Amino acid sequence: MMIPWQELSSETLDNLIESFVLREGTDYGEHERSLEQKVADVKRQLQCGEAVLVWSELHETVNIMPREQFRE
């Protein structure tokens, strides 16, 4: 189920994004990016619709994923 990120408090959204970024551990190439930069990137992706916030009833978890990968 998709969660409208706009309905979350900014603190909750920031905490979810930070948790996601720390969990992902993605390699950003030659230049490591700060946590703040990674959080800002994910927030921008949510704002422009490239990424969505998703609740998994099966796993009872929240995740962030590319919009094109989301299947209801």
Curated annotation (Swiss-Prot):
InterPro entries the record matches: UPF0270, YehU-like_sf
Family, per entry: Belongs to the UPF0270 family.
UniProt name for this protein: UPF0270 protein CKO_04772
